[in-house]
């Protein structure tokens, strides 16, 4: 089995068993941009499982670092209304997220 096949099987397990995606269900996938290959596989498998729509939210630690270093102090605790509404709207959806920081030291030197 090659790496691509292994990734697809892992994604299928996460979608069908972990998230238990059902026919017609909306799915919300989130993770770091470095995990794009896995997120794409999760998206494919969610559609194969019958998802009606898959939304992907990529996060970028370099953008977060810029906010911490350069942005106003208020940005650290600010949560826009549209983000709160998104959380409420997607609460009943199947959710899949990737974890694991590919650059664990990126934010280490920040206070």
Give, region by region, the residue ranges found by the protein language model.
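Active-site bordering "gate/hinge" segments
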Residues: 1-111
């Amino acid at each position: 089995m090659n790496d691509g096949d292994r990734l697809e099987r892992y994604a299928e397990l996460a979608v069908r068993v972990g998230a238990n995606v059902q026919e017609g269900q909306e799915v919300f996938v989130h993770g770091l941009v470095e995990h794009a290959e896995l997120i794409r596989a999760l998206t494919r498998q969610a559609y194969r499982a019958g998802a009606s729509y898959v939304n992907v939210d990529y996060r970028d630690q370099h953008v977060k670092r810029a906010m911490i270093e350069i942005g106003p102090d208020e940005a650290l605790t600010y949560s826009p209304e549209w983000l709160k509404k998104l959380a409420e709207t997607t609460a009943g959806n199947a959710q899949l997220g990737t974890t694991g920081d590919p650059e664990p030291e990126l934010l280490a030197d920040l206070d």
